[in-house]
């Protein structure tokens, strides 16, 4: 043997498998070969292929035969002196003719009497059948204590550690331990929301710094801080910023408000530089709206010219058709003009909606509180409008969509 099996005792294989190796050699007696039908050196799968070994022949097990007249079967050494018959009958005292005077050990075995103690104690209760008794060092396999003893008498500590029940209802860690960068936090949604809020706080902080910087620049420009209506400049800057989108929205809804003096008084800010910036922004927005309107009108005029050209080409075909179709054609043209006008209005509305600032409150689009209440309560609709009285025959009519 060149390899040690017990790697824990000889991890570097220093023993070399000789007489001084870490494995004690098996005894070379014939008993071990007969015992379980195994060869002398039982080869494992890790010992390598068979080279000089012979194929291990299976030896028949020694069967325990019942006692016969010429060779009674021998019981185990710990059940030698018993009166339990070999064939398995109940216990009865042996015949007096065959009895020899019992030595103290046989008396203890047979009657459970202690030679030194003639009292009623635990040493009296010996098992009648020694087959019920276990050989020393063997485990108790049945009884009222369940399968096996709870604590082995030779073992001072339990084999399995006690289970910590506090960890039983914890969520299962499916991913196991990973590197810190690879592991997602326990509540990923909460983590993402925290990041979002942190970004919002940083943005607010940046806006405050910018407002303070603007106020400082305005003060350096020669405007005394006493002119400002609010207590401190940074807060006034923030208020102006929040007020700006509403004013812009008002200007775009009604351009005549741009030049009204009342609005200018109402909208007057502590820094005229900011007022000029607002006016510039408003003018730019109006210019953009006008330019967009002009572009849309020019595109629509080109489309109308193309339509008219195609209409002129189609005139000859229409003359060939029946005279009754002329009235329908005029109605179609009127409908087209109406659609074009509505398209123009929608285009203007879209152009206005395009320039809505992102910070605009959505309550403007809903309307006043009274309208909102009516809208929610459906008070402006009568009961017949909500649930129209339709005859039942019409409910089961299937509209014909083939034409």
From Swiss-Prot:
Residues 275-346 have a biased composition (Acidic residues). Expressed in testis. Residues 209-220 have a biased composition (Low complexity). Keywords: Coiled coil, Differentiation, Nucleus, Spermatogenesis. Its main location: nucleus. Residues 137-157 have a biased composition (Basic residues). Transmembrane segments: none annotated. Residues 292-353 form a coiled coil. Disruption phenotype: Knockout male mice are infertile and have malformed spermatids, though testicular size and body/testicular weight ratio are comparable to those of their wild-type littermates. TNP1, TPN2, PRM1 and PRM2 expression is down-regulated in testes of knockout mice. It is found in: Nucleus. Pfam families: CCER1. Residues 1-11 have a biased composition (Basic and acidic residues). One of its GO terms (biological process) is spermatogenesis. Residues 261-271 have a biased composition (Polar residues). InterPro entries: CCER1 (IPR027889), Coiled-coil_domain (IPR052696). It comes from the Eukaryota. Residues 1-23, 51-70, 134-164, 202-241, 261-350 are annotated as: Disordered. GO terms for cellular component: nucleus. PANTHER family: COILED-COIL DOMAIN-CONTAINING GLUTAMATE-RICH PROTEIN 1. Regulator of histone epigenetic modifications and chromatin compaction into the sperm head, required for histone-to-protamine (HTP) transition. HTP is a key event in which somatic histones are first replaced by testis-specific histone variants, then transition proteins (TNPs) are incorporated into the spermatid nucleus, and finally protamines (PRMs) replace the TNPs to promote chromatin condensation. This is Coiled-coil domain-containing glutamate-rich protein 1.
